[in-house]
Amino acid sequence: ITIDEVQAAHGSLKLMANVSWEYDKLPHMLIAGGTGGGKTYFILTIIEALLRTNAQMYVLDPKNADLADLSAVMPEVYYRKEDITACIERFYDGMMERSETMKLMDGYKTGENYAYLNLPPHFLIFDEYVAFREMLTTKENAAVLNKLKQIVMLGRQAGYFLILACQRPDAKYLGDGIRDQFNFRVALGRMSELGYSMMFGEVDKDFFLKQIKGRGYVDVGTSVISEFYTPLVPKGHDFLKEIGRLMQQRQDGQAACGAKAAGTD
């Protein structure tokens, strides 16, 4: 499908004609991609689609590469080590706080999630995760892993979701069963046998390497691995411009709502 057809609604994000990420039911996405696999475009496509909803996003790009450029057009984009660590902590605190306040809300019902209470989902989009972990001291690593573990275990109900991307999902940095908490896993571009087994576990499947940008394999949370093609980005599509436009629209909308609420409309 083309990127205009990538739409998020009712806790589900459509990514291919027959592939959606049902983040409300099967939370957290893990993306692995070798160079030239189309990983960055795929992440930008997700950001653009989620901006059309009421989702709140936080973008972490420790290599200060393409995603860091988004800081020109949207808030909550970080690339410095300290800022990234602080953002993870804020995201975690926000999740814990929401879990508490949800229980006190009028419409709260046991077993219902954030969407039932009309709260917006929050997404922490973390590129080059392995590269980031390699920059940290042992102590810092433990603190970050602890927070991420809590987020993947507790985030679904409160609507706090993690999208983690890396070149290859090194077991060293996705240990302690944290990898299994990522229900939607996509491997883009060419990966080694080891890369695939780190991504999908030990599977009896032959992976064919076709030289097509944006092609890979996906497990949508059903433990069935199928071929995957990232949404097509038309030539000349300017993500920065489009994301900036959507961000502006959103701010204008909020300003209008604010004015209305203040009775100045």
Where are these regions (language model features)?
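Phosphate-handling catalytic cores of nucleic-acid transaction enzymes
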Residues: 255-262
